[in-house]
């Protein structure tokens, strides 16, 4: 049985011990679904970490977005430093899928920018699932999208043992089959170099170590892991397994067989299009498909090879695609964080993808089999999902219908109770809000304000600013990195008030916020549903003086339900505190970027002395970098400098550069 070593100085408290006991009991009893109804600040992640350490099963943690995934990755990495905590999210910094707009006869080519570091982390995640039982994978909805099948992927792996009989040329051919490239000058991920009988291989899934294979005649004399930057040998190895550069690597015989099937489908489709007098579409399809076949024959892959995934994986028409779920062992556990958001996301992916692909097929840009390159449908996801724990402060209808058990975690370990709720008239909401802000600012506390529209948030920000309030606003036009920095500045006290619309909700951890003001709370709709109201009110639940003000001229059904649920929780929390003699304590957390919480593989713990000048230069750049493209550009510049310094044998300076690259990659995690 795998050992999960939970490292923490905290003991479960409040409702946590009972919640952990019930969840473990439910899993052991074979319950397919359970819900952890945990209020904001009750330590849901800590409870789940305790459950994982007790049941000792590989776990997939599904988060609704990259920001929360990065936060969870950092927390689990801290809880389980000796286990395989991995990160599996979309590796696209930018993605424009191919599409056709018939009304204007416009074809949009697929355009994408792949983040090399995230790709490495994805490969590391699947390797951990295949090799280890103590794996925790933090992921987003990208886990339901097609991935190379685990059977094909495993057929391509290469095992090398010390003492093996191995011809050097055969080894190099096998590396080429894994899509590794030879590069004797620039040693990077998924490359190898040859120096006499010594072959250095940089594994595709590694960011820390390369492998040195030393041959004596046709025998593997030595295997060792070494630092690819300094060349320092880290340890000797008895054996090592090399995985392909990509999840989509296909054995040559499978590729040839797939190409024959593609030709058969192409012929059938061309006959159909010509019978419908769609000659332009037929000519277009034939030209594009034959070009792809030529590329596959010569190179082993082509651009858009995922559109032929049905043949490459040997699936029948309409079968679900292989995904990350296929890499999970049968006894795995699925934890869905903020399930009221994550579960609907899973259901929404299929339809949007389908409508775009149907247009491409109809107008001759793709074969009908391209429709099978898709995310899983919701029913397919339900069928393949292992035992599941839904985690949310406001579970949705799906969780309510499916959960075999609902476990409440309402009492916080700190003794903090849910905020008091006041209802005030909407007619004078702005002036009343201004006076409340001045009271909080005088106490050095922060305020969150939610509005209904982007225009209103900007106008309110201008109004408050004109009246001497230090204020910023937050909405969807602001990119993820800047969004995190704004939240960080609020916590640091750079400003006192943050105005937003729908972004001030799930997962935001801001203990300094003592007041949440909800404007126009009586406008029924998505932004003022009972779940939205409870989530927004919860942002003040980490502060000892937490309070929520709802500005409304009438009490809606959603308000009534939200207030009723909050009062129910308050009563339970206060009763628990009285019974156990607990005095509520405020939460104090170090102010750090969410991304800094995610310790990325590659950021070393060794403290390096090194070029002060380079450090100053990089610190100056760091404040200027905002968008993912700027950060990626900076990473590429630093990597070039780093490799040049390594070639010049200036290893201290190169290590300094590497540490800077590690910090920048952490910032990219949540983008």
Curated annotation (Swiss-Prot):
Residue span(s) of domain Helicase ATP-binding: 25-412
CDD domains associated with the record: DEXHc_UvrB (cd17916), SF2_C_UvrB (cd18790)
Boundaries of every UVR domain copy: 632-667
SMART domains in the record: DEXDc, HELICc
Gene Ontology process terms (BP): nucleotide-excision repair; SOS response
Binding site for ATP: 38-45
Biased composition (Basic and acidic residues): 614-624
Cytoplasm listed as a keyword: yes
Molecular function as annotated in GO: ATP binding; ATP hydrolysis activity; DNA binding; excinuclease ABC activity
Residue ranges of every copy of the Helicase C-terminal domain listed in the record: 429-582
Keyword terms: ATP-binding, Cytoplasm, DNA damage, DNA excision, DNA repair, Excision nuclease, Nucleotide-binding, SOS response
Pfam families membership: Helicase_C (PF00271), ResIII (PF04851), UVR (PF02151), UvrB (PF12344), UvrB_inter (PF17757)
Domain of life where this protein originates: Bacteria
Region of interest (Disordered), ranges: 601-624
Motif placement: Beta-hairpin: 91-114
Subcellular location as annotated: Cytoplasm
InterPro entries from the UniProt entry: Helicase/UvrB_N (IPR006935), Helicase_ATP-bd (IPR014001), Helicase_C-like (IPR001650), P-loop_NTPase (IPR027417), UVR_dom (IPR001943), UVR_dom_sf (IPR036876), UvrB (IPR004807), UvrB_inter (IPR041471)
GO CC entries: cytoplasm; excinuclease repair complex
SUPFAM superfamilies per record: C-terminal UvrC-binding domain of UvrB (SSF46600), P-loop containing nucleoside triphosphate hydrolases (SSF52540)
Protein family (similarity comment): Belongs to the UvrB family.
Domain notes: The beta-hairpin motif is involved in DNA binding.
Quaternary structure and partners: Forms a heterotetramer with UvrA during the search for lesions. Interacts with UvrC in an incision complex.
Reported function: The UvrABC repair system catalyzes the recognition and processing of DNA lesions. A damage recognition complex composed of 2 UvrA and 2 UvrB subunits scans DNA for abnormalities. Upon binding of the UvrA(2)B(2) complex to a putative damaged site, the DNA wraps around one UvrB monomer. DNA wrap is dependent on ATP binding by UvrB and probably causes local melting of the DNA helix, facilitating insertion of UvrB beta-hairpin between the DNA strands. Then UvrB probes one DNA strand for the presence of a lesion.
Protein name according to UniProt: UvrABC system protein B
């Amino acid at each position: 049985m795998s050992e999960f070593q939970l490292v923490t100085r905290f003991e479960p408290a409040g409702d946590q011990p009972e919640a952990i006991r019930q969840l473990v009991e439910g899993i052991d009893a074979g319950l397919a679904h359970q819900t952890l109804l945990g209020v904001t600040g009750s330590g849901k992640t800590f409870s789940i970490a305790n459950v994982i350490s007790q049941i000792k099963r590989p776990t997939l943690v599904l988060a609704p977005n990259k920001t929360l995934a990065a936060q969870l990755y950092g927390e689990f990495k801290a809880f389980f430093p000796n286990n395989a905590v991995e990160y599996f999210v979309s590796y696209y910094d930018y993605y424009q899928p191919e599409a056709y707009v018939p009304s204007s006869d416009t074809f949009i080519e697929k355009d994408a920018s792949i983040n090399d570091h995230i790709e490495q982390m994805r490969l590391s995640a699947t390797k951990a699932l295949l090799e280890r039982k103590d794996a925790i994978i933090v992921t987003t909805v990208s886990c339901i999208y097609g991935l190379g099948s685990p059977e094909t992927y495993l057929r391509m792996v290469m095992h090398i043992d010390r003492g093996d009989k191995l011809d050097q040329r055969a080894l190099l051919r096998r590396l080429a089959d894994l899509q590794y490239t030879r590069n004797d000058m620039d040693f990077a991920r998924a490359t190898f170099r040859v120096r006499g009988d010594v072959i250095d291989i940089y594994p595709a899934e590694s960011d820390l170590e390369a492998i040195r294979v030393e041959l004596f005649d046709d025998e593997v004399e030595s295997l060792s892991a070494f630092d690819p930057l300094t060349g320092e040998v880290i340890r000797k190895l008895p054996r090592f397994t090399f995985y392909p550069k990509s999840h989509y690597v296909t054995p040559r015989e499978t590729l040839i067989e797939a190409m024959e099937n593609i030709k058969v489908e192409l012929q059938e489709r061309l006959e159909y299009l010509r019978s419908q007098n769609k000659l332009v579409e037929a000519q277009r399809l034939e030209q594009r498909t034959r070009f792809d076949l030529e590329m596959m024959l010569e190179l082993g892959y082509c651009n858009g090879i995922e559109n032929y995934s049905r043949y490459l994986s040997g699936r029948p028409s309409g079968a679900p695609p292989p995904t990350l779920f296929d890499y999970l062992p049968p006894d795995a556990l699925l934890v869905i964080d903020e399930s009221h958001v994550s579960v609907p996301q899973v259901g929404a992916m299929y339809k949007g993808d389908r409508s775009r692909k149907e247009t491409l097929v109809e107008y001759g840009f793709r074969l009908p089999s391209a429709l099978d390159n898709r995310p899983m449908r919701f029913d397919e996801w339900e069928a393949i999902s292992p035992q599941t724990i839904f985690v949310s402060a406001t579970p949705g209808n799906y969780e309510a219908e499916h959960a075999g058990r609902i476990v409440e975690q309402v009492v916080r370990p700190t003794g903090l109770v849910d905020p008091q709720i006041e209802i005030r008239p909407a007619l004078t909401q702005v002036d009343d809000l201004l006076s409340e802000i001045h009271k909080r600012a005088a106490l050095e506390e922060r305020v969150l304000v939610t509005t209904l529209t982007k225009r209103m948030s900007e106008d309110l920000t201008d109004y408050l600013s004109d009246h001497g309030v230090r204020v910023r606003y937050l909405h969807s036009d602001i990119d993820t990195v800047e969004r995190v920095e704004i939240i960080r500045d609020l916590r640091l006290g750079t400003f006192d008030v943050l105005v937003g619309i729908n972004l001030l909700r799930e997962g935001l951890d801001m203990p300094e916020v003592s007041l949440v003001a909800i404007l126009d709370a009586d406008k029924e709709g998505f932004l003022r549903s009972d779940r939205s109201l409870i989530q927004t009110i919860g942002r003040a639940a980490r502060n000892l003086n937490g309070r929520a003000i709802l500005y409304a001229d009438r009490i809606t059904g959603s308000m009534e339900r939200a207030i009723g649920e909050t009062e129910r929780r308050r009563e339970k929390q206060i009763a628990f505190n009285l019974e156990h003699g607990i005095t509520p304590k405020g939460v104090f957390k170090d102010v750090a970027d969410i991304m800094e919480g995610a310790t990325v593989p590659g950021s070393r713990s060794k403290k390096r002395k090194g070029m002060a000048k380079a450090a100053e230069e990089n610190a100056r750049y760091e404040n200027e970098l905002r968008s993912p493209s700027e950060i990626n550009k900076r990473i590429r510049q630093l990597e070039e400098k780093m490799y040049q310094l390594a070639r010049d044998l200036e290893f201290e300076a190169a290590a300094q550069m590497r540490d800077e690259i590690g910090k920048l990659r952490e910032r990219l995690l949540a983008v």
